[in-house]
Design a protein with these regions (language model features):
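Short, low-complexity disordered leader/linker segments with a strong preference
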Residues: 1-30
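Extracytoplasmic "Venus flytrap"
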Residues: 31-52, 56-60, 67-77, 97, ...
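An alpha-beta-alpha
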Residues: 53, 140-187
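Structural motif
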Residues: 64-85, 191-203
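Periplasmic-binding protein-like
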Residues: 89-96, 116-118
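Hydrophobic alpha-helical
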Residues: 95-109, 199-203
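Flexible loop/hinge segments that line or gate small-molecule binding clefts
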Residues: 108-132
Length: 203
């Protein structure tokens, strides 16, 4: 729900820039791009983003057109963002941390396109960032793990050692420690956002 509200807010701001201000003129359609790091069927991060995209379509109807692309983090993502901007996107959601620098680079070339980047820390005149309070869920998980562990050792598989993920680890550890002062966390870095096989091997 928070993700959807963020999308709605961004769309409202974008609409203010691209839609005519005169009531007797027809309103233009806002074109919104979504760039995903994983498949929409992952039942996780990308899946929830795509549910938000679909709800935006339902709410705004023919006032909005959405397009989507799935591309790994890295140089090719910049090409995909550029292509979206060239094809008329007014607002582009770049939905993974590793898209940060490509987002900044492409935004500099397309000052009239608005960008929303997930979980990053770099901004520009036309680049904003968004995130969620993931640490709240990690706090609950840590509390449960602290109660349940019989060895006092809790394994934690982290995606990447970046602020967003580390904040979640800290939250889990603090709340596990609160109920079990002897608890220890063992962190394993997967260095991927979506690789079920690798994540299972790490576990």
């Amino acid at each position: 729900m928070k993700l959807l509200k963020g999308m709605m807010s961004a769309l409202a701001v974008t609409a203010g820039f691209v839609m005519p201000s005169y009531a007797d003129e027809p309103k233009d359609q806002v074109k919104v791009g979504f760039i995903y790091v994983g498949p929409t069927g992952d039942h996780g991060w990308t899946y929830r983003h795509d549910i938000g995209r679909q709800q935006v379509e339902e709410k705004y109807g023919d006032r909005v057109e959405t397009v989507l692309e799935s591309v790994p983090e890295g140089p090719d993502s910049e090409r995909v963002m550029t292509d979206m901007a060239l094809k008329g996107a007014d607002l582009i959601f770049t939905t993974s941390f590793g898209y940060m620098d490509p987002t900044i680079n492409v935004a500099a070339k397309f000052p009239n396109v608005k960008f929303e980047h997930a979980t990053g820390y770099k901004q520009a005149e036309n680049v904003s960032v968004y995130s969620a309070r993931f640490y709240e869920g990690r706090a609950v998980q840590g509390h449960i793990a602290g109660h349940m562990t019989k060895s006092n050792i809790v394994g934690y598989i982290g995606s990447f050692p970046i602020p967003e993920v580390i904040r979640g680890i800290n939250s889990a550890y603090i709340h596990a420690k609160d109920v079990n002062p002897d608890v220890q966390f063992k962190i394993i870095w997967a260095y991927t956002w979506f690789d079920p096989t690798k994540e299972a091997d790490a576990a």
